[in-house]
Each structure stands twice: as C-alpha cells, then as structure tokens.
Amino acid sequence: MALTKADMAERLFEEVGLNKREAKELVESFFEEIRQALEDGVPVKLSGFGNFDLRDKNERPGRNPKTGEEIPISARRVVTFRPGQKLKSRVEAYAGNVKQS
C-alpha cells in the first residue's frame, strides 16, 4: 500500500496535533513549494532524504512498439531524484525484511 498525501495529513493530525484542515494545507503547501522550485529550474535538496534535480534530455530516435515505425522522441526536461545516504541506508537495512507487493 502506498503512502498518500492524505495519509501524511492524517499522521500530522494524530502526532503533531494540527487540526485536519491545517494538516492537509501543510502537506499541500510542502509539495507545492517543491513543484514551484522545480518549475522555476531550482534543484530541491532535502537533507537526510535526497535531491530532486532537473535534467534536459536531447531528442533521440524511438520506435512505435505497435507498428515498428521509427519516430523521434522530442527533447524534454525531466525530474530526477537521487536518494540521500541516510535514506539509502535505511531502505537497504530493511530490504530483506519486507515482502514486495
């Protein structure tokens, strides 16, 4: 089961004591700040978690999987995420203990 923004807001309500409206607004505001920074071309660095960066990809040849026809894949900007060392360590520590769904 995936962790959702609603789950995060619920945890803020339960553990921090914000009311549900404030918790939802805080979660939305947090992600809006990340979206806005990336939209403005600013990398996002969250210490202990990881970095969101922008990368420009050049146009490249591609293929339509149904027809086999060659088609160009246009140049575009993509968001990349690189996990920080603390996050990597914690995930790797649990890698053998959790069943994948």
Swiss-Prot record:
Name of the protein this chain belongs to: Integration host factor subunit alpha
Cross-referenced Pfam families: Bac_DNA_binding
MF (Gene Ontology): DNA binding; structural constituent of chromatin
Taxonomic lineage from the root: Bacteria, Pseudomonadati, Pseudomonadota, Gammaproteobacteria, Chromatiales
Domain of life: Bacteria
Family note: Belongs to the bacterial histone-like protein family.
InterPro entries reported in the protein's UniProt record: Hist_DNA-bd (IPR000119), Histone-like_DNA-bd_CS (IPR020816), IHF-like_DNA-bd_dom_sf (IPR010992), IHF_alpha (IPR005684)
Assembly and oligomerization: Heterodimer of an alpha and a beta chain.
Cited SUPFAM superfamilies: IHF-like DNA-binding proteins
Its job: This protein is one of the two subunits of integration host factor, a specific DNA-binding protein that functions in genetic recombination as well as in transcriptional and translational control.
Keyword line: DNA recombination, DNA-binding, Transcription, Transcription regulation, Translation regulation
Cellular component, GO annotation: cytosol
HAMAP family referenced in this protein's UniProt entry, alphabetically: IHF_alpha (MF_00380)
GO biological process: DNA recombination; positive regulation of metabolic process; regulation of DNA-templated transcription; regulation of translation
Gene: ihfA
